[in-house]
Regions:
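Glycan-recognition and catalytic cores of secretory/periplasmic carbohydrate-active enzymes
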Residues: 1-196
Length: 196
């Protein structure tokens, strides 16, 4: 099973609760967060899996070992947003920040900067040839997540994280001549395709 399903459940229930004024959707949100914690968060190896077996165990195969740092960081800010909506719920803040911390550590490229698109949970080869490219959207997710983490915790490390991702992304993805962002960079930060 994939983490996308509880993530979609979480964010959809947030929108339905807000727009319909129906607090019964909070139960759906709680269920989604519980599934993410129980099945996809792996504290023993400090990561969030993209896909797991039905029982939450890691599948030792290319697809099963794949980490998608940007997607997990998006999950972090969905949870942090719910924490904010609940009056800064400390348990949800811990969960969201833990996901953010783990996946920034797993996903940040120590040599060239930026977030890798895919990683292997055991640092084995990754199946997808674009695994080491830098896509625009994971950086946007990290900018949002780090800013939310900073606003909820006041911890300086999230200000530093936010500045790091913001500066790296804006210095490489931004088209300074025509505006907007390029979508895809090579690992070293060079524009791969000038599409927007």
């Amino acid at each position: 099973k994939a983490i996308g399903e509880p993530m979609i459940q979480l964010v959809t229930a947030q929108e339905l609760r807000l727009n319909l004024g129906d607090d019964s959707f909070t139960g759906d949100i709680d269920d989604a967060i519980e599934e993410i914690r129980r099945d996809f968060m792996k504290p023993e190896i400090e990561c969030v899996m993209e896909m797991v077996a039905p029982d939450g165990s890691i599948i030792d195969h290319f697809d099963g070992r794949t980490l998608n740092p940007g997607h997990a960081i998006e999950c972090a800010w969905f949870i942090l947003w719910e924490a904010k909506l609940r009056g800064n719920d400390p348990d949800l803040i811990r969960t969201g920040c833990q996901i953010l911390d783990w996946m920034m550590a797993r996903g940040w490229d120590g040599e060239y900067g930026g977030l890798f698109y895919f990683r292997d949970v055991y640092d084995k080869p990754v199946q997808e040839y674009w695994h080491d490219m830098k896509f625009w959207w994971p950086h946007n997710e990290a900018i949002i997540a780090s800013l939310l983490a900073l606003s909820l915790t006041g911890e300086e490390k999230y200000a530093t994280m936010h500045q790091l991702v913001h500066d790296w992304a804006h210095s490489r993805f931004a088209d300074k001549e025509h505006g907007e962002l390029y979508g895809y960079l090579h690992r070293d930060g060079r524009v791969s395709v000038p599409l927007k």
